[in-house]
């Protein structure tokens, strides 16, 4: 069977949480979802529910029943929740983490839509003037005698029309691919001391810190020791995040306190201080959850700020292009007048 799609995993998790909170046994909850979902949900999803039920007939473990049907990381989290007896809250936490991650991704993509549209509009306007407007002046005055500002605009527009825009898109795609690769794999002092202070690496760091706090909160709430929690979070993660987690584990093995052990440049100083103060208290998992919520709110604010900055930059770029076009036209008209 294929992995259940994110859409249906969220549906499944939501219904399971509601039914389990109403004290309906797990198998009965799955049976109810299957029976009521026929004709509403996708056939493959219903088959997946049936497979989960069949697996649970021979093994009551939900973890084993879901293995291969959901991502390994979610399997690990459900296993922890199941072993702790807090399966409902564990599934709810997994669902929330997925929704939060999707929301952040959606806002990040949305923040780039306006600049992208503005860039395309700018290229179309420049190409349009070069192809439709400026050629009418060629019969009156050779291009070689046009003002420099007009020649530059004319040549750029024709280059865009003849395929430069494709090269621009390819360059942007390659650049983004390189950035994604670097954000997942580059580690060390150069990453910690320099790259992580710049976009998009600082956003990657903030997202990772938020997810780390949310996951550790759930694991601690399920009575998983902190060191074991780090191993679970480290499962199938990026090379960059794994390097932080490995350093945390090494620091804890040396007997350092939380503030020192977790100081790998992933978490900010305020987070580290809060964790150090509350680490020995029974409600430490609640404190971690609060930190995760605060980090998530701050991340949304940063993305909103970035979106505003990018929008302003794109508007300025478009405005400068329009000024360039009118300047080129007026310069050309003035040149023509003086040549007559």
UniProtKB/Swiss-Prot annotation:
GO terms for biological process: protein secretion by the type II secretion system. Signal peptide: none annotated. It is a multi-pass membrane protein. It is found in: Cell inner membrane. InterPro entries: GspF/PilC, T2SS_GspF/T4SS_PilC_CS, T2SS_GspF_dom, T2SS_GspF_sf. It comes from the Bacteria. The chain crosses the membrane at residues 108-131, 146-161, 312-333. Keywords: Cell inner membrane, Cell membrane, Membrane, Protein transport, Transmembrane, Transmembrane helix, Transport. PROSITE patterns: T2SP_F (PS00874). GO terms for cellular component: plasma membrane. Belongs to the GSP F family. Probably involved in cholera toxin receptor (GM1) interaction in order to bring the cells within close proximity of the ganglioside for efficient toxin delivery. This is Toxin coregulated pilus biosynthesis protein E. It comes from Vibrio cholerae serotype O1 (strain ATCC 39315 / El Tor Inaba N16961).
């Amino acid at each position: 069977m294929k992995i259940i799609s994110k859409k249906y995993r969220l549906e499944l998790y939501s219904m399971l949480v509601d039914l389990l909170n109403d004290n309906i046994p797990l198998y009965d909850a799955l049976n109810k979802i299957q029976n009521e979902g026929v004709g509403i949900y996708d056939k493959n999803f219903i088959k997946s529910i049936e497979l989960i039920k069949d697996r649970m007939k021979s093994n009551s473990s939900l973890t084993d029943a879901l293995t291969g049907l959901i991502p390994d990381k979610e399997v690990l989290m459900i296993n922890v929740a199941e072993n702790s007896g807090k399966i409902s809250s564990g599934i709810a936490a997994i669902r929330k983490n997925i929704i939060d991650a999707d929301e952040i991704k959606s806002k990040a993509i949305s923040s780039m839509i306006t600049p992208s549209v503005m860039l395309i509009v700018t290229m179309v306007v420049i190409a349009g003037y070069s192809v439709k407007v400026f050629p009418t002046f060629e019969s009156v005055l050779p291009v070689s005698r046009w003002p420099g500002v007009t020649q530059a605009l004319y040549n750029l527009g024709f280059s865009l029309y003849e395929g430069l825009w494709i090269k621009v898109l390819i360059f942007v795609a390659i650049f983004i691919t390189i950035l994604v690769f670097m954000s997942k794999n580059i580690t060390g002092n150069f990453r910690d001391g320099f790259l992580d202070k710049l976009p998009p690496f600082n956003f990657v760091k903030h997202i990772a810190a938020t997810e780390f706090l949310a996951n550790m909160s759930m694991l601690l709430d399920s009575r998983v020791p902190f060191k074991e929690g780090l191993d679970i979070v480290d499962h199938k993660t990026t090379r960059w995040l794994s390097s932080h987690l490995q350093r945390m584990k090494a620091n804890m093995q040396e007997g350092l306190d939380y503030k020192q052990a977790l100081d790998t440049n992933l978490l900010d100083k305020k987070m580290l201080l809060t964790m150090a103060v509350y680490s020995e208290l029974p409600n430490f998992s609640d404190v971690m959850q609060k930190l995760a919520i605060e980090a998530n709110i701050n991340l949304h604010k940063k993305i909103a700020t970035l979106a505003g900055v990018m929008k302003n930059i794109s508007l300025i770029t478009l405005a400068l292009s329009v000024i360039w076009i009118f300047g080129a036209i007026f310069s050309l008209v003035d040149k023509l007048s003086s040549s007559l």
